[in-house]
Amino acid sequence: VTASSDGVLSDIKVLDLSQGVSGPFCAKFLAGLGAEVIKVEPPGTGDSSRHSEPFLGEGDGVESSALFAYLNTSKKSVTLDLDIPDQARSVKQLAQGTDILVESYAPGYLESLGLGYDTLSEANPGLIYVSVTPFGQTGPYRDYKGGDIVAQAIGALMYTIGLPDREPLKVGGESVLYTTGISAFSAAMLALHVRDAEGFGQHVDISAMDVMTVAQIHSSINEQFGHTPVRRPTNLVRAKDGWVSPGLESGVQQGTWPKVCELMGVPELADDSRFTTQEARRTNQQDLLKVVGDWAATKPKEEIYHTLQALRTITGYVATVEDLLVARQLVDRQFFQTLPDPVHGDVVHPGAPFRMADDAWRLLPPPRLGEHNEEILNGRLGFPTRNWPKSLTLAGRSLSATTNKPALQGLRILDLSQVAAGPYATMFLGFMGAEVIKLESRSRMDINRGRAKPGPRDPRVYPDGEQGERPYNRTAHHVHRNINKLSVTLDLAAPKGKELFLGLIRVCDVLVENYRGSVMDRLGLGYDAVSEANPQLIYLKISSQGATGPEANYGSLGSTLEQTAGLASITGYEDGLPLMTNEVYPDPVVGILSFGALMAALRRRRQTGLGCLVDLSQREVTSMLLGESVLDFSVTGRVAGAMGNKHRDMAPHGVYPCLGEDMWVAVSAGTDDEWLGLCLAIGQPELADDPRFKDTGSRRANHGVLDEIISSWTRGSDHYRVMHLLQAEGVPAGAVLKGSETIVDPHLEARGFWDTVNHPEAGIYKQTTTPWILSKSPRQPAVPAAGLGEHNYQVLGGLLGLPTSEIDALVEQGITGDVPDPSA
């Protein structure tokens, strides 16, 4: 591997055989890092997404889809029919010179054409073969059809979204398919990291169901600890021009509430017992929202956002796609980029999902169908099989073998992150074999740990509701998100604590933190300081708004990110207000992407010998889930809104009641064949000839009638039974599962998705693992989350060489220890 100014993947060739959303999104990210991506499309029709709304111009030509244009930037397009043997052989020849192949066909289809992993890897042992499918390559559902709404249902993300008295609701747009693509990207980068080190390629198995089960970061663990999942009303209040989330129930510093009261012109409420503490404000949320709503009704939403953020609250506002393009933070960071289009003029695209040193993110216009046939098919085919670097041979490594050692063995991570996004990223690193040292302060523990001692009205979830003697070691979120980590405490405000921190920096490869913009700089421990201590260190900064810009010090929660990134503006019932997920959806998305960003930074270090700063904005990443709507608005001026559970291209597409209390099934029919299958499954084949439902447009126009017909059938059966009956007829469908149901789902069990953890203080529970399976780099077993400071002596003594007596003295001084500061 050699360094290049053209991107960390400039030496990598990618063959993109995928269609739709997830696989192409994965390949788009690889192209953004500099890889040459050759997209193979069917002649005439092209990728299925070329026919997906919204369209940038009149008609639905193959060059007009905003979705295709967004997903396929910086790629080359060739047309080949895989069912024609000569053309399949051309694909096989292309694969011989390929580093990464991405595909999304039904399991077994490419194998039947001689294009499966086993066949292609014989000629190209270093090939990384990424399969992205609804249910993965194994398990009883592997041949089932999927889609965005099906994955949200079967992965339990959907169950807690929406209002208590209505059907569960999907996250708007194609966001889940995008997240599946991000998982594929991160897994591909992991496999490339292994190949760079060991020489062999492997098969990467990505299942949208796995990804969504990872993404429901509350339900599965909370239900095991005795918490009942619910759909909750929103906490939004109406501003003059939209909606805001005041953010006064959590994350508010002591002393802020009186300032807010003064600002709102109600100073008398500063001492009102309903609102004086965070717990009181949570208990009296509706009264609080009434007070704030009266004040907010006459003010613009962004003014409220900036005013309250200046008081250190975690406030959000529901940004529309139109708002995003003029949001001052995104404009200042030049997140959106304009690309020329020969037909539609200038088209605005979301830019880089993360920033790595001064490396540019490659963003070029999407290809026209078959644009590169002459260059690739007529000019390049016939090139010799790839010559692997001699260094691999000299090292005596077999390209086809596996070492059976953990993928990230020898990599050491210092983890300062809290809450969800950062801990999720480092949890994945631990699962793949990295040594992760979680660093906290006794006075400022990870928020996931909760309280220093038991107390009343604690909103966190504990096993069977019992806080225990050490509640900080047994909260659901702590034990779930901090698997496979060591725990160390240091007071970073103390000179000795800073000295020891820099000592750890010198022996670590990666630092991960997700504080507000300038926190580490104020401590004197920002990137300049740590890179001076260790020039090879990779510093991953995950922040709400990014490391730069006028809002760099603004805070957020997953729910407010859904608002400011625009996701809430396209999520909701058709006749209602914007809604957020109850799974803080941006956090797992960012956690999964952060893993891939680190793999890219490690490859850059391999090339240059130097570490770097990786700047990842959670708002920017989340806004990428609305990519096609951004493009559409920039050309047509259309502002995307909520569609409930409906879809632009499919009908029927919704969630339907089943037998039992609050039981549901998600169903989507995107083709005439799937519609016919649905008619057969419900025992009404005559509907296939009904003029009201003759094509997708007719079915969309009569969606309400269809919903009644389908609901009358689904009500009489169990949600799993409905799913299986529909899938047997080739209809995409998924039971809307609770988190507790995913734990016993036979497909996830067959895929080995869950690990059983026996935590010394929280008991036995099932743990989510990783959103990928690598054929030669298995994940490591889950090791229970550590108690606070459990490894102080092991790490400070073993890594830094401190004698036990000195660590004892540090405990006496309060610089380290295994019990919280009483004020925590």
Task: Describe each region flagged by the PLM.
Residues 310-363, 728-782:
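A glycine-rich dinucleotide-binding beta-alpha-beta segment and adjacent secondary-structure elements
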Residues 233-311, 315, 322, 328, ...:
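Aromatic-enriched alpha-helical interface/lid elements that frame and gate functional surfaces
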Residues 44, 134-136, 208-213, 241-243, ...:
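Glycine-rich beta-alpha junction loops
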Residues 68, 224-229, 234-236, 251, ...:
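Short Gly/Pro-enriched turn/cap motifs at secondary-structure boundaries
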Residues 181-202, 214, 218-224, 259-267, ...:
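Oxidoreductase and adenylate-handling cofactor-binding alpha/beta cores
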Residues 347-385, 765-804:
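C-terminal active-site "lid" helix and adjoining low-complexity regulatory extension at the edge
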Residues 1-200, 223, 368, 372-610, ...:
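N-terminal helix-loop segment corresponding to the beta1-alpha1 unit
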Residues 168-179, 231-234, 243-248, 276-279, ...:
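A short glycine-threonine-serine/GTX helix/turn-capping micro-motif
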